Curated annotation (Swiss-Prot):
Name of this chain's protein: Diadenosine hexaphosphate hydrolase
Family that this chain belongs to: Belongs to the Nudix hydrolase family.
Subunit structure comment from the entry: Monomer.
Organism: Thermus thermophilus
Positions contributing to Mg(2+) binding: E46, E50
Co-factor note (free text): Also able to use Mn(2+) and Zn(2+), but the activity is less than that obtained with Mg(2+) ions.
Reactions catalysed: P(1),P(6)-bis(5'-adenosyl) hexaphosphate + H2O = 2 ATP + 2 H(+); P(1),P(5)-bis(5'-adenosyl) pentaphosphate + H2O = ADP + ATP + 2 H(+); P(1),P(4)-bis(5'-adenosyl) tetraphosphate + H2O = AMP + ATP + 2 H(+)
Impact reported for E49Q: Very little effect on hydrolase activity
Length: 126
């Protein structure tokens, strides 16, 4: 099983950061930890690399598991984060932006991500 880490990132307006991946799915930024890197550090780095947004971890959420298109099982550890700034696209991504919770609910492709959004909104400090 491959380990991953990602961020559910909100700005001060309570908008959430989403990416549109190579296959056209709207998702949260995530990726693989580098050797010697904690999952929290990996999540912060992946948000930066994939979106250009500097984010800080507020608290851990929970892991999700899925099988990727290559048949590899992945476990992604998620963190609630605060960030600001205009997103920019990493090569291979087809969209990025800040969205209201209502917009995000309509865009997110996977049920696990919808669940993460709801838990993150409940735990997000005012």
């Amino acid at each position: 099983m491959e380990l991953g880490a990602g961020g559910v990132v909100f700005n001060a307006k309570r908008e959430v950061l989403l990416l549109r991946d190579r296959m056209g799915f709207w998702v949260f930024p995530k990726g693989h930890p580098e050797p010697g890197e904690s999952l929290e550090e990996a999540a912060v780095r992946e948000v930066w690399e994939e979106t250009g947004v500097r984010a800080e971890v507020l608290l851990p959420l929970y892991p999700t598991r899925y099988v990727n298109p290559k048949g590899v099982e992945r476990e992604v550890h998620w963190f609630l984060m605060r960030g600001e700034g205009a997103p920019r696209l990493e090569e291979g991504m087809t969209g990025a932006g800040w969205f209201s919770p209502e917009e995000a609910r309509a865009l997110l492709a996977f049920p696990e991500d919808l669940g993460l959004l709801e838990v993150a909104l409940e735990r997000l400090p005012l």
